[in-house]
Amino acid sequence: KYRILISFGNNEKGKSLLRLANGLIKKQKNTSSITAMHLSLSDEVNTFNIEDKEKNSFHQIIEESQLLKQDITTVFKATMDIETEIADVANHGDYDLLLIGLGKSIFEGTILGKVIGLTTRIINPDRLIDKFTGKEGLFENSPFDERTRQIISRTKMPIGILIDKELQQVSRVFIPIFSSEDSFLIDYAQKLIYNNNSEIVLLDVNGYLNTNFVMKSAIDSLEQKYPNNIGLIADKIVRKEFLDQQDLMLISIGSWKQLVDSRSTWLSSVPSVLILKH
């Protein structure tokens, strides 16, 4: 069975993560499952309000699951330490993929928020992202906040981090390939094509798609099986018009760091982004 665990804070993000998970498995419902987990800090929950809190937390995601005709299992927990709890549940629960959202608030007033087009607010120079990456510089440390970084470092399984720009569907997906390490992304492309009939465009940033045997053969077999669902571009310049048509960018964690460090101008036009670590 292919088992996905979604951990969400707010309802909108939970719905986006569910749409994404559904796109990865919807034709394989007998051999897959989705668990949606909401964690609350213990001091916000007491025995009197726990049921109400649980109902409110899942109301919208359950409605969304009915629209998608997707069964889900829900898990609600009160905990003192949300990051540790997410990693523990993921590591001990026999899951194949953990999906979490990256809060928009993290980007407010940061340079990265501006770079990826999530905030237009003027930046306060004192705050210059220094909590975001430690003091050493713009992105050397990690293009993630502390919470996400803790979850990534503690989780011993594949993890996807969604930067959610109101993701509605995953019909058009764009995958930049930066290095031979990115070959695992082809597995996700295949899942989306098979389960969701997604159209996938691969961007060959450094020419690996032709020179790397593993990647080339994986893509060749996908092209033979699904000629209408896969396209390649070798253009270094990604146009805004192209990005505007995409629902999601799928990228590995290493390539995300490279992309952010390169400050590519097109970053501000990216759609929702799923950053994958395997």
What feature does the model see in each segment?
Residues L20, Q60, E85, R147, ...:
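Well-ordered alpha-helical segments embedded in enzymatic catalytic cores
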